[in-house]
Amino acid sequence: STTDSLDSGTFENSMMTNTGMTFGNHLMEIGSDGQLRPELAESYESSDAKTWIFNLRQGVEFHNGKTLTSEDVVATFDYHRNEDSKSAARGLLTAVTSIKADGPNRVIMELNAPNAGFPYIVSDYHLLIKPSMDGKIDSQSGIGTGGYVLQDFEPGVRATFKRNANYWKEGAAHFDEVEMISLLDTAARQSAVMNGDVDAIDRVDPKTVALLARVPTLEILEIAGTLHYTMPMRVTSEPFDNLDLRLALKHSIKRQELVDKILLGHGSLGNDHPISTANPFHASGLPQREFNPELAMKHYKASGHSGTIQLSASDAAFAGAVDAAQLVAASAKEVGIDIEVVREPSDGYWSNVWNKKGWCTCYWGGRPTEDWMYSSAYVDDTEWNDTDWRSTPDAVKFNSIVKEARAELDVDKRRSMYEETQRLIADDGGAIVPMFANHIHAVSKTIAHGDNVAGNWSSDGGKFAERWWKA
């Protein structure tokens, strides 16, 4: 989007996630094998899951020549967590009561309650460590510690990089130069990789996978993970403030049809919550929600609603989002619910439509842990709660359980808690989650990658520039 910014607190699409991962690093990272490991932190420790100590790597330099110290970490986190912050990561850090430097290479973070999964949180792509001066960071700076130095950035257009000769990671960042181009048009993206104008594309339209697979110079790279496509209803906006209406819409969707016609089988059914089978505490025991016209009509009549309901859609959300919205409208029509699909422009979609209009199409990369996913988009104090589900009795109960689960070390008890949170979201929340999608890329065979490719984000967890190389 032309509103994109180098302020990592505003990152909201794969173009910016990849840009940040290319010029910056985080305290922790998710490896290509899906495992959590230290990045700018060399090690971490906690005796009670409430006080966390991160020991920093020594000798790491920012692109401006400044040596990384604990002050940079403190200033970065303070930027994202201060009361006036508009950072999407602010909700992730509300549990942090204090963060302080203990010498130049040690950071101590105090939480208001134990959270065994906190090291995952500090790997969030928004929490990119930037250099500080007088206790502050320049949020608009493109200076980081990553494998590539940002050369040029045109919002919504392109970003170019040169290899960082002083990169601290061994065996990483193999390209001399990297250029990322924002191609929102699916056909343009496909043509670019087929013609050799680009070496790789992400978010391949499932409809073109078979075509691209026949191109002898290309490899189709497909990874199942936590990526899911959603249609968030803002529960504080009419008519979605009515639970019966929300349930009517949830029961009006032919999910298998969406998986078959939109994903062409490159994914699986969703059950109106964001936790996938790749997550440790997926609630497999919840009944799969199906197209149920009788139940949908019962709820619709109980809602008292009549007239047209608008669903804003754009393929900026995901390939085939407009078609998916049309299928939802068609199945709802069988029930007797009138849905008008509003085609929204791709440019500015994330700024003007998502998290603003009452009902729209969306995608979420998902997160490796339940708490991280909830902290990003479902708890009551995150900016990215795109359903605004915060104050219903079930939402209050959900938030309470999430806080309890963070401190619960008994695995069976945590599982029970997280299963209950998934039920609460599915039955009361505003998220329609009809399907989980595989990450699909088309990559030139002149580009090589490791045996493992991360599924936490597209493009090898956003770190393709660091992890891939010329074949």
Language model regions located:
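N-terminal lobe/hinge region of extracytoplasmic solute-binding protein
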Residues: 1-48, 78, 143-145
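Structural transition elements
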Residues: 269-302, 316-322
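Ligand-site clamp/hinge motif
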Residues: 136, 166-211, 338
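Extracytoplasmic/peripheral linker and loop segments enriched in polar/acidic and small residues
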Residues: 338-348, 375-445, 471
